[in-house]
């Protein structure tokens, strides 16, 4: 019972941390210095990656198995709050599924 409680609390803490990172991701146009140094400074980059992932998922549903090279393949590192950068559209514990 104690182990289950500890696991549930740990899961809730991790989920809260992810939501905090997502909310403070630095997309504030008034203060671009909040963004991390390695992050792309183009504000449209997320929309573009989302469009690529959507197009690739549509192509896969239609049987056109030609995923774009612009998305991350399976077992690649990804950002938890941007799963659309993965070709599969799923980012699990910072790895594309």
Swiss-Prot record:
**Proregion positions:** 23-68
Tell me the leader sequence span. 1-22
Which UniProt key words apply to this protein? Cleavage on pair of basic residues, Disulfide bond, Ion channel impairing toxin, Knottin, Neurotoxin, Secreted, Signal, Toxin
The source's superkingdom equals Eukaryota
**Can you supply one Gene Ontology CC term for this chain's record?**
extracellular region
User: Does the keyword section mention Secreted?
Assistant: yes
Localization terms from the record: Secreted
Q: Where is this region: Disordered?
A: 23-46
In its UniProt record, a GO molecular function of this protein is: toxin activity
Disulphides: 71-87, 78-91, 86-96
> Which tissues is this protein detected in according to the database?
Expressed by the venom duct.
Q: Does the record bear S-adenosyl-L-methionine in its keywords?
A: no
Q: What's written under domain?
A: The presence of a 'disulfide through disulfide knot' structurally defines this protein as a knottin.
Q: What does this protein do?
A: Probable neurotoxin with unknown target. Possibly targets ion channels.
Q: Which family does it belong to?
A: Belongs to the conotoxin O1 superfamily.
Annotated protein name in UniProt: Conotoxin Cal6.1a
Q: Which organism is it from?
A: Californiconus californicus
């Amino acid at each position: 019972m104690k182990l289950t409680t500890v696991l549930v609390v740990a899961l809730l803490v991790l989920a809260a941390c992810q939501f905090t990172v997502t909310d403070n991701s630095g997309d504030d146009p008034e203060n671009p210095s909040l963004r991390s140094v390695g992050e792309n400074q183009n504000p449209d980059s997320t929309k573009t990656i989302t469009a690529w992932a959507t197009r690739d998922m549509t192509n896969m549903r239609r049987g056109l198995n030609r995923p774009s090279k612009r998305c991350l393949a399976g077992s690649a590192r990804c950002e938890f709050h941007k799963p659309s950068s993965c070709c599969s559209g799923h980012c699990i514990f910072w790895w594309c599924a």
